């Protein structure tokens, strides 16, 4: 859940504390971001192997993916932050890798928040 996680080991795009958790998240490095992407793919593969026809990827409500999209929680100055194109890199990469791993017939729904009200 990114910075919303109630754990001293929480991670996020940047070290921006959530108002609902006492812990400041660790800003992920490239290796950590790629592990998170791989974990999304692994979870999608588990859903498919369990017989699901598809999954919904939660890119909204202030959770992990959404934290990369929003300037308030993404203070990065690398390929994962800054411009809107860079901030969209994480969700696009997750979707592309899931699609590549599971094929065109596995249903993917991506929930995207259109207005950021959660800080």
Question: Predicted regions span which residues?
Answer:
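Flavin-dependent oxidoreductase catalytic cores
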Residues: 1-119
């Amino acid at each position: 859940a990114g910075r919303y996680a109630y754990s001293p080991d929480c991670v996020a795009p940047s070290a921006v504390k959530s108002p609902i958790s006492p812990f400041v998240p660790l800003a992920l490095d490239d290796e950590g971001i790629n592990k998170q992407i791989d974990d999304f793919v692994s979870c999608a593969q588990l859903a498919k192997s369990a017989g699901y026809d598809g999954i919904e990827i939660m890119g909204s409500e202030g959770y992990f993916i959404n934290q990369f999209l929003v300037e308030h929680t993404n203070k990065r100055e690398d390929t994962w932050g800054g411009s809107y194109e860079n901030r969209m890199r994480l969700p696009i990469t997750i979707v592309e890798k899931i699609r590549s791993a599971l094929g065109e017939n596995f249903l993917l729904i991506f929930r995207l928040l259109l207005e950021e009200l959660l800080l």
